[in-house]
Curated annotation (Swiss-Prot):
This is Small ribosomal subunit protein uS10. GO terms for cellular component: ribonucleoprotein complex; ribosome. GO terms for molecular function: structural constituent of ribosome; tRNA binding. The gene is rpsJ. Part of the 30S ribosomal subunit. It comes from Phenylobacterium zucineum (strain HLK1). Pfam families: Ribosomal_S10. Belongs to the universal ribosomal protein uS10 family. The lineage of its organism: Bacteria, Pseudomonadati, Pseudomonadota, Alphaproteobacteria, Caulobacterales. InterPro entries: Ribosomal_uS10, Ribosomal_uS10_CS, Ribosomal_uS10_dom, Ribosomal_uS10_dom_sf.
Length: 102
């Protein structure tokens, strides 16, 4: 028999919001009777931007800014129909990007 898996991939700039959303998904899945693998932390993507501090002179004086993108992966093994319904109704934070693969 073919086992159905749901893979949920979460991305956010703030790791605290990401961990909170991950905990909500795990608790919802466990409450409805599904088994959960994860959350698995993926490597953080750091994107750096270097700009001149002064608009006129001092080329050597620069400032760096960075954006960190934190990622997590969850696998829900053998989800029940109640699990799918509960995950659809789940309201997550605005700063979290969610990708779901069946």
């Amino acid at each position: 028999m073919d086992r159905q898996n749901i893979r949920i991939r979460l991305k956010a700039f703030d790791h605290r919001v990401l961990d909170h959303s991950t905990r909500e998904i795990v608790n919802t899945a466990k409450r409805t009777g599904a088994t959960v693998r994860g959350p698995i932390p993926l490597p953080t993507r750091i994107e750096k931007f270097t700009v001149n501090r002064s608009p006129h002179i001092d080329k050597k004086s620069r400032e760096q800014f960075e954006i960190r993108t934190h990622k997590r992966v969850l696998d829900i093994v053998d989800p029940t129909p109640q699990t799918v319904d509960a995950l659809m109704k789940l309201d997550l934070s605005a700063g979290v990007d969610v990708e779901i693969k069946l």
